[in-house]
């Protein structure tokens, strides 16, 4: 099995613009958000569409949508993972 190439099209990141553009440069689908409502709509939509195997969400955005994060933990796919923002981990 060749593990030297990862299909980054199956990975998404949601967070403030400064963080997601760095991930976008690595080939991930980037979804910059600037409000809790926008984050809720974006993350819920990504989960519902099931087009990405892993959805990374910055910690600061995750704190704004704990209900969506909790709901996502009840299902196997896609995986939702919190990551530090450009300001670092909390």
Predicted features, each with a name:
Residues 4-40:
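N-terminal first-folded block
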Residues 66-90:
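C-terminal structural segments of small proteins and small subunits
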Residues 8-9, 51-52, 76-78:
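Short coil/turn connectors at secondary-structure junctions
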Residues 53-57:
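Periplasmic-binding protein-like
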Residues 41-48:
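Acidic, metal-coordinating helix/loop segments flanking the phosphotransfer/catalytic sites
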Residues 35, 58-60, 84:
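Short secondary-structure boundary segments
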Residues 1-2, 26, 50-52:
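Short, surface-exposed connector motifs at secondary-structure boundaries
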């Amino acid at each position: 099995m060749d593990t030297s190439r990862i299909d980054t099209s199956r990975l998404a990141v949601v967070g403030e613009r400064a963080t997601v553009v760095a991930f976008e440069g690595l080939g991930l689908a980037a979804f910059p958000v600037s409000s809790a409502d926008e984050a809720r709509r974006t993350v819920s939509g990504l989960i519902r569409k099931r087009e990405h195997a892993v959805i990374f969400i910055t910690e600061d955005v995750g704190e704004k949508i704990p209900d969506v994060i909790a709901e996502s933990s009840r299902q196997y796919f896609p995986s939702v993972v919190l990551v530090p923002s450009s300001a670092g981990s909390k």
